[in-house]
Amino acid sequence: MLQKLMSVFLTERSTAILQIKYKSNTIQLKTDSVPLAEYHKPVYLLCDQKTFSAGEGFAMILQNRKRAMVIGETTAGAGNISGPYVVNDSFVITIPVGVINDVLTGKGWEGSGVVPDVAVKSNDALAKAIEIIQKKR
C-alpha cells in the first residue's frame, strides 16, 4: 500500500523505493508504473513521536528525495517488520522478521526515527508549516 501512495508524489515509475531484508531473501517495493493520481505541488509533512511504521516510511522516502519538508518532532523509530509467533494456547509474541531500508540511502528508521527538517514541538508544527508556506508565497 505504501508504494501506491508514494507513486502519487514521486515522478519515477516502477522505481525501487524500499528494500526489505528477511532472513532468507530480500525484496524491493517499487512505485507503480501507472499511479492512481499525481501530485506535483510542495508537500509539508507534520510528524511527531506518535508517527510510526508506514507513516515514518512515507516521511523518510519523500524527505530523502527532497520531495517533502518534514516539520515537527523525530518520529517513533518503529521500522522493522514483525510477525506473531504462538508460544502456547494463551501466549503469543511478536518478533522482528525483516528490516526495511530506503534504497536511496541504504538506511531505515528503526530505532532512530525520521528527524524533521524543521524541529518544533508537536503542538507548534501546524503553525510553523503555515508560516513556512506563507513565506514562500
Task: Give short role names for the model-derived ranges.
Residues M1-L46, K50, N80-G83, V97-V103, ...:
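Gly/Ser/Thr-rich loop/hinge elements
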Residues L2-S7, H40-V43, G55-A59, Q63, ...:
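Extracytoplasmic/secreted envelope proteins and their assembly/folding machinery
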Residues M6-S7, V87-F91:
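Short, hinge-like loop/turn segments at secondary-structure boundaries
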Residues S7-S14, T51-F52, Q63-R67, Q134-R137:
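Sec-exported extracytoplasmic/periplasmic mature domains
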Residues K50-S53, K66-G79:
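Short, well-structured beta-strand/strand-turn elements
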Residues F58-A59, S82-Y85:
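Histidine/acidic-residue-rich catalytic or RNA/ligand-binding cores of hydrolases
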Residues D89-V99:
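Acidic, Ser/Thr-rich peripheral helices and adjacent loops at domain boundaries
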Residues K107-R137:
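Low-complexity, Gly/Ser/Thr/Pro-rich intrinsically disordered linker/tail segments
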